[in-house]
């Protein structure tokens, strides 16, 4: 599939996955599609292409949620400014005080592409879903930490049907250490099943209706668990699956585990031992993946293993 040239941080393999899933959805009943985290619209555009090629789509609403803002001193600003200058859309940025609003950039890249595109500009915590339609496909490129993901569970997962598709865009990501355990809990409770991966994205299918009581049970399980143990469990669960660029992305779960062991569990010795054994193993069989993983580890050290602070610069 040839996609429009739109700046963004998802890979071509992830664009193809978004297109394939959107095109294959059964939208013959009244369903909606939801995207959490749209940036400039690269992922949005991929989904739109799929929906436009979906023969069962007759008026489904596509809801997109994003603050469409960042702070000048935040982590996201370098990408917002850099991409907008490179693609010559920086005149569409609205700068006020320490804030940069890029909603008009998103509108520029998505204008007249899909009749029923509904934009929600707000922080995730302030989001609501009031559409009466069930959600056929939920694409999540927003929460990197469990407290935000818990909001997603409460706000959006209640509206998913059995058979609905969910893509966690940054699942195989060293920032996602507190989100990954929650997804393992959902696997253990047989709420979801594995479909496939593309780069850092994980595609799953909803196998059991998720209600408020189930969300409470997930949270109770999470609060009582050792996060690094849950990450190890999902690492083992997925080790036998076909994972895109297996050595790199699967072992990014180990990077997330190391971050959790240091930041959340104060287990520095265990994290050091795991780091040494991981790099010794991967370095022998895949030096290129080991080099990329080393960059993740250096990123941890640079930020004292506290990635929440970087995230907060953009969202608080």
Regions inferred by a protein language model and the residue ranges of each:
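S-adenosylmethionine/decaboxylated-SAM
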Residues: 2-4, 23-312
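A Trp-anchored, charged/polar loop motif used as the substrate-binding/catalytic surface
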Residues: 15-20, 122
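Conserved SAM-binding loop and adjacent beta-strand
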Residues: 4-17
